[in-house]
């Protein structure tokens, strides 16, 4: 079934020893509307409810969030306390809290968009047990205010979302993730610790376990095949010709939702202007735009006010939109991990979707320059030369992928 299980635990469907009678199935149906769990979800949830640390590595759209949200409800009902969810993106936590509240689950977030008064109120309510889940960024954990709250509150679980951010070998290393284990060590009682990510190589998995100090975790690695996605690579012959190909593709798929990834902000602006000039409702997203514009573009795309998003890889983690029918890459990504994560935004509803990569030898030079300017981390544990060699190895894998798929026959959706 494509699932590997390490340190498997026995099934635990309820907290019988604590007088807990609410069945897992009833909770699943009542709050989330599902009749059953997917393969892999059950094992992770059983592990959490048995008091075990867990690590879930599951592809985009496989239902990672449910693996901690459902047991959080079960544990809160059993009097175990609140679940802290550590998320790297403000937009992601806002979307998830909104969805949870709409489902009748009491959840809140704390981030820089709130006033000091709102933060104090949220922490007060969490301490009183009014919330099942509390979402925070990793940077929040080390503040005196949050440490004071965590030292007094009853915490059932600490969940680390996008856990690959803890590894320098991953594509989205975030130094603040390295402080999570120290935060957990400061708690008066160690809660269950769960970690989830969509993409992680063996070395990244080892880093997650080691850097989070997971204790003999139940580890689930599901298969990464997405049979509803059709992949192809086409030759990018020249600027104007490629632009016409992209424009014609979007026109052929009028009314469908799509994402176009570009390697540089300059290309994002160029492709975005091309689409808008031709009457296509397109948004743009890159680090050079204001936070307000990025937020507005993401919301407009999420709620189908825009049909196309043109973006750099800054538009990546946590994009919760199920009906994306295509993902185009105007440039080759730096690694297969990046490509899998970005292309994986398509077809999350299980319907057919297409992933097209426009490849040019020029992309190799662009990516080499981007890697040369990549800011090296301050962690002395890994040599900069090792990191550069690893980045180059990943780039070479990406190049081989493009060479192999170039000129392949079109997918059924082109017919």
Give the predicted meaning of each segment.
Residues 16-57:
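Conserved pre-motif I regulatory segment
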Residues 363-405:
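A conserved SF2-helicase RecA2
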Residues 26, 49-50, 55, 62-65, ...:
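Helicase motor core with emphasis on the C-terminal RecA-like subdomain
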Residues 407-415:
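Single conserved hydrophobic/aromatic residue that forms the stacking wall/gate
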Residues 70-96, 103:
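Conserved SF1/SF2 helicase motif Ia
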């Amino acid at each position: 079934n494509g699932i590997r299980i390490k340190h498997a635990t026995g099934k635990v469907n309820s907290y019988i020893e604590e007088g807990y009678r609410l069945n897992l199935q009833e909770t699943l149906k009542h709050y989330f509307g599902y009749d059953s769990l997917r393969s892999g979800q059950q094992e992770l949830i059983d592990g959490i409810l048995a008091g075990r640390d867990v690590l879930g590595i599951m592809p985009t759209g496989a239902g990672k969030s449910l693996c901690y949200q459902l047991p959080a409800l079960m544990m809160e009902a059993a009097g175990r306390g609140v679940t802290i969810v550590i998320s790297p993106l403000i937009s992601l936590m806002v979307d998830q809290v909104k969805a949870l509240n709409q489902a009748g689950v009491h959840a809140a977030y704390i981030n820089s968009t709130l006033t000091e008064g709102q933060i104090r109120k949220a922490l007060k309510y969490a301490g009183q047990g009014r919330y099942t889940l509390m979402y925070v960024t990793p940077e929040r954990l080390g503040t005196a205010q949050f440490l004071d709250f965590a030292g007094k509150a009853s915490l059932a679980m600490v969940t680390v979302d996008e856990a690959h951010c803890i590894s320098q070998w991953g594509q989205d290393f975030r130094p603040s993730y390295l402080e999570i284990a120290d935060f957990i060590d400061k708690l008066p009682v160690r809660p269950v610790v769960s970690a989830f990510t969509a993409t992680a190589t063996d070395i990244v998995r080892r880093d997650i376990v080691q850097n989070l100090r997971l204790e003999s975790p139940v580890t689930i690695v599901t298969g990464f095949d997405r049979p509803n996605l059709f992949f192809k690579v086409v030759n990018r012959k020249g600027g104007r010709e490629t632009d016409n190909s992209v424009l014609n593709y979007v026109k052929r798929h009028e009314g469908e939702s799509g994402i176009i990834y570009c390697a540089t902000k300059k290309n994002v602006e160029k492709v975005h202007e091309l689409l808008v000039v031709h009457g296509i409702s397109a948004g743009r997203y890159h680090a050079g735009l204001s936070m307000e514009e990025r937020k507005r573009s993401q919301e407009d795309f999420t709620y189908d006010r825009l049909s196309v998003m043109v973006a750099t890889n800054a538009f990546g983690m946590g994009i919760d939109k199920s009906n994306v029918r295509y993902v185009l890459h105007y440039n080759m990504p730096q690694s297969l991990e990046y490509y899998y994560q970005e292309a994986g935004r398509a077809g999350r509803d299980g319907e057919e979707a297409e992933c097209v990569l426009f490849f040019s030898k020029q992309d190799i030079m662009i990516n080499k320059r981007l890697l040369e300017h990549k800011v090296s981390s301050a962690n002395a544990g890994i040599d900069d030369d090792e990191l550069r060699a690893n980045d180059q190895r990943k780039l070479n894998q990406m190049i081989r992928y493009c060479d192999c798929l170039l000129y392949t026959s079109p997918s059924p959706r082109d017919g």
